[in-house]
């Protein structure tokens, strides 16, 4: 049986995906193809490059420290624009280049440069900000046709593909690619499982995060952007998962996109909840 694994987006919650991978490996569940959006693309790409869950966990903590840092120059530009031009003149608070560099460094250690160099079937979605087109970065041949609304690319650096899929609007700057601006894949495809079906997966396990009904009392601009996106993604989720048999919902209590101090806790929850639901998965 060919098994596919789909990892949804969720910022720092992606640490739970790593715990889930650890649990699946311990149960000897072999993953044949994998997809991931946003933080799910970080985990899925590293796993496809044959990094172990333990190695991915350590790298994810490194990512968290780097990408949670706000670019001071961008803050200065933001303040300058608001005061002197009466408008916002930046695309995001973080360029995302640190994420690109770290992923690309790990790829080079495996003698991988572009996503097509990865042997395991891998799919990472991103969205064209200009017209809403879905870009699928894939390790497979470009001639594979998913549908007319998808554009597939396999001749892109894996670090750049992950950076694009993680470019959360307002937080990370869009990625420029051939006169396009690419943003977080979760805007349109937060649970990219159907593509795995088209790859011939007999069984697809999708790991998603339960909707958080509450919101913290003290919120800032970033919190508002993130919460609005979460509401949109959960509405999209109801449409996306129609027809999906194996869904593992991970509970994450009031965790915001960049709450990196919760990485350890989320990893443990992903592991524990996957173990608890193993009877439904097998």
Predicted features by range, described:
Residues 1-37, 45-282:
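Patatin-like phospholipase
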């Amino acid at each position: 049986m060919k098994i596919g694994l789909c990892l949804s987006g969720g910022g720092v919650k992606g640490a739970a995906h790593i715990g889930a991978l650890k649990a699946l490996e311990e149960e000897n569940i072999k993953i044949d193809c994998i997809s991931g959006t946003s933080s799910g693309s970080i985990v899925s790409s590293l796993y496809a490059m044959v990094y172990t869950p333990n190695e991915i966990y350590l790298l994810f903590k490194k990512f968290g420290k780097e990408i949670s840092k706000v670019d001071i120059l961008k803050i200065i530009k933001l303040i300058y624009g608001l005061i002197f031009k009466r408008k916002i003149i930046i695309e995001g608070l973080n360029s995302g280049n640190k994420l690109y560099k770290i992923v690309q460094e790990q790829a080079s250690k495996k003698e991988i440069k572009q996503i097509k160099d990865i042997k395991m079937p891998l799919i990472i979605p991103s969205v064209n900000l200009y017209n809403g087109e879905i870009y699928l970065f894939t390790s497979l041949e470009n001639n594979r046709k998913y549908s007319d609304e998808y554009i597939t690319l396999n001749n892109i650096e894996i670090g750049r593909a992950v950076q694009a899929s993680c470019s959360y609007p307002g937080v990370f700057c869009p990625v420029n690619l051939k006169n396009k601006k690419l943003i977080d894949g979760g805007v349109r495809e937060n649970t990219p499982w159907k593509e795995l079906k088209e790859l011939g997966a007999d069984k697809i396990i999708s790991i998603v995060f339960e909707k958080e009904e509450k919101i913290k009392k003290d919120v800032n601009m970033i919190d508002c952007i993130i919460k609005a996106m979460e509401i949109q993604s959960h509405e999209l989720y109801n449409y996306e998962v129609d027809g999906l048999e194996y869904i593992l919902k991970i509970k994450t209590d009031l965790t915001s996109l960049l709450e990196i101090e919760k990485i350890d806790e989320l990893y443990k929850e992903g592991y524990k909840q996957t173990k608890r639901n193993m009877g439904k998965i097998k």
